[in-house]
Amino acid sequence: MNVLSCSINTLIKEGLYEISGVEVGQHFYWQIGGFQVHAQVLITSWVVIAILLGSAVLAVRNPQTIPTDGQNFFEFVLEFIRDVSQTQIGEEYGPWVPFIGTLFLFIFVSNWSGALLPWKIIQLPQGELAAPTNDINTTVALALLTSAAYFYAGLSKKGLGYFSKYIQPTPILLPINILEDFTKPLSLSFRLFGNILADELVVVVLVSLVPLVVPIPVMFLGLFTSGIQALIFATLAAAYIGESMEGHH
């Protein structure tokens, strides 16, 4: 990705005075064989996964009849994910709860980590650490996983008859129906990436221009929208899976 420079300039007398510059797109690479891997995305993703696994183990390692606060919280999250899955997928939602739950929790914690974890204090030879969902590679990977999931759901339920949906309700819509399946992962990935990147850029620019206390309301708004984006992604993933199993909607 080319370096994207966003500069805010103020006209002073005869020239422009640069107040703030924010660069996005520099990466720290690991060379693995003949491949270059975005190291900072892997590092932050591993941290998020460790947080999720550690929290789950601590909360439910010793289940109680009268649940503790941690166990109660995770049971609430599980019930919430089950409700979302059942609403969007229908009666056969059960096998898809782990997939939808994993998507929701990974995206939710990734988004919040961008605002709550001090990634910037860890210095890298190139680039800087940020939320995993701040990188287009992560959001595209999540969207492609979703695409693979709804194709698998449709084929496992209907076999090759799944592809008959492309000519419903009329064969004239064949190109549009095919295009729809290709645009779903694009819309999922760019919606999530754009919202998280824009939120972090706004906070960085405000912090560089005004005292820290001023951007705090924007940071709280970012936490709220980050949670909403995780819910939207998981809900759409469940809806696509339900649609592929039920037929043309």
Curated annotation (Swiss-Prot):
One of its GO terms (cellular component) is proton-transporting ATP synthase complex. The chain crosses the membrane at residues 40-60, 97-117, 136-156, 201-221, 222-242. It is a multi-pass membrane protein. The keyword Plastid applies. Keywords: ATP synthesis, CF(0), Chloroplast, Hydrogen ion transport, Ion transport, Membrane, Plastid, Thylakoid, Transmembrane, Transmembrane helix, Transport. It comes from the Eukaryota. Its main location: plastid. This is ATP synthase subunit a, chloroplastic.
